Design a protein with these regions (language model features):
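Active-site-adjacent "subsite" loops/lids of carbohydrate-active enzymes
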Residues: 47, 53-75, 135, 146, ...
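Aromatic- and acidic-residue-enriched segments that line the glycan-binding/catalytic groove
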Residues: 102-117, 152-180, 218-237, 280-292, ...
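The substrate-binding groove and active-site-proximal loops of carbohydrate-active enzymes
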Residues: 59-71, 111-127, 180-195, 237-249, ...
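Glycine-rich, aromatic-flanked loop segments that form ligand/cofactor-binding clefts
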Residues: 46-51, 89-100, 128-178, 214-216, ...
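Aromatic-lined substrate-binding rim segments of carbohydrate-active enzymes
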Residues: 94-149, 233-263, 328
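Catalytic domains of carbohydrate-active enzymes, especially glycoside hydrolases
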Residues: 75-102, 207-212, 304, 310-313, ...
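Active-site neighborhood of glycoside hydrolase catalytic domains
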Residues: 192-288, 292-317, 323-344, 349-351
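Substrate-binding cleft of secreted/luminal carbohydrate-active enzymes
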Residues: 299-325, 339-426, 438, 442, ...
Length: 448
């Protein structure tokens, strides 16, 4: 293709091409936002992600009890989604694969024990929690993002003997590694593990009308595992074992990005990593912090994923208060804001709503915690590179009436969850139009 495509030599064609792409993107945007009765609920241009995680691991948020009773499971979801709507949230991140399992009908992973009490046991009446949650969220004008934990198989070693017979970890024990506590994980260095995880995510996007596929901050275990046998095959190519481990996680992220968008062009694929990528004292590009960074601790190069454009959004878990010496909230927000600038990758901030309930730190106690969370949200709205927030986790709003009321206050003016186009590198020569990757229909660069 002509490398000068879109330059002044082509007159107004570059502008017309951009308009054409915008029209195409708009055609793809119908699944990004849902309003009751088919009406558009929010004003054009008024976009902000107002998200909340709905955790199912250890039944943190859902279900209220492990049961096969479909009525109980339905009513729990209805109650949760009604409250989320009442608080002004416009997106929910529903954990559907907490531990190598499924809260949906899967041909790959077994039904979750957190749902029915026994891994592999289905709910009554053919009930499918994910399908029901998607329909109910959309009926309330909210996006539904399916949240998976990619590698984790068991949350405690006590669960190891109780895996379902059809669990891929049972059928393929060669793919499993264990950490120092005996918890089981799929080996990130094994290509078959990557294929399994990606196939599982693709199954969700293929079979359900989800708005996004979301992964959280668990990658390599923190320690105590042995992957020497796998590394031996790659040692010549990667003399540095840490670099090899990071390349394995990178491969998962890149493959996931490509596979999901090949199925559904406007799917939103994003990750919620640790709030710290790396400290400046360890990496020149790092933040002015002194906490545990994902780059070295769990081999997750979250900054690199943004720079490479492998994700549609990044949602760092900045779970500290403003002024916290080890990891200042404001410092990290500014650092991540600089990281995403000009990339077309959206930045959402992961907020520690749970600290207003469980923290003993003065900054989070009582009214201080309410004010802290309010300030975070308002400061984010003042930063043009921050496109919203997501709170961990739902049950804390039920435990703390003050932050329930806070959400109603700060979300009193409705906003649409993002899903529109972002034009970056708009120099007419290497334009990239990103609306959750519908620009994949076109080259990333118009150069050959």
């Amino acid at each position: 293709m002509n490398k000068n495509f879109g330059t002044k030599a082509n007159g107004g064609f570059s502008f017309l091409m951009k308009m054409l792409i915008l029209v195409v993107c708009a055609a793809f945007s119908t699944s990004a936002f849902y309003a009751p009765n088919g009406t558009k609920a929010f004003a054009d241009g008024n976009e902000e992600l107002r998200g909340v995680w709905i955790s199912t691991v250890a039944n943190i948020d859902y279900p209220s009890q492990q049961t096969t009773d479909s009525n109980v499971l339905k009513n729990d979801l209805i109650n949760i989604l009604d409250n989320c709507k009442d608080m002004g949230f416009n997106a929910v991140f529903f954990q559907v694969r907490p531990c190598g399992d499924a809260l949906y009908k899967s041909s790959i992973f077994p039904w979750s024990k957190y749902l029915t009490g026994t891994q592999g046991l289905a709910p009554n009446d053919g009930f499918d929690p994910l399908q029901f949650a998607v329909e109910e969220a959309h009926a309330r004008g909210m996006q539904l993002h399916a949240w998976i934990n990619p590698y984790r198989i068991t949350n405690t070693s006590a669960d190891n003997p109780y895996l379902a017979k059809q669990n891929p970890a049972v059928l393929n024990p060669n793919l499993v590694i264990q950490d120092s506590n005996g918890k089981m994980y799929y080996n990130p260095g094994d290509q078959a593990s990557i294929d399994l995880i990606v196939d599982g995510a693709a199954e969700i996007v293929q079979n359900y009308d989800v708005d996004g596929l979301h992964m959280d901050d668990y990658f390599y275990p923190d320690g105590g595992y042995n992957d020497d046998g796998t590394y031996a095959y790659y040692k010549d190519e990667y003399p540095d074992k840490a670099a090899w481990r990071r390349s394995n996680v990178d491969k998962l992220v890149k493959t996931m990005d490509e596979r999901l968008h090949s199925i559904k062009a406007n799917i939103q694929f994003g990750i919620s990593p640790r709030g710290i990528w790396a400290n400046k004292s360890d990496m020149a590009e790092g933040s002015d912090t002194n906490g545990g960074g994902s780059y070295t601790a769990i081999y997750a190069d979250s900054r690199g994923w943004v720079k490479n454009g492998w994700i549609d959004y990044i949602m760092p878990q900045i779970y500290w208060n403003i002024g916290y010496k080890i990891a200042d909230y404001s410092v990290l927000c500014d650092w991540w804001s600089d990281v995403v600038a000009g990339t077309g990758v959206r930045l959402y901030i992961g907020e520690a709503a749970y600290r207003t309930v469980s923290s003993t730190t003065e900054a989070w106690r009582g009214e201080n915690g309410v004010n802290e969370l309010r300030t975070h949200i308002l400061n984010g709205r003042a930063n043009p590179n921050i496109s919203g927030y997501c709170c961990f986790t739902y049950n804390n709003f039920i435990k703390n009436n003050a932050i329930y009321a806070l959400m109603k206050e700060v979300n009193s003016e409705a906003a649409e969850a993002p899903g529109g186009a972002i034009l970056v590198n708009g120099d007419g020569q290497n334009d990239i139009l990103r609306r959750n990757h519908p620009w994949r229909m076109f080259p990333r660069s118009f150069s050959t």
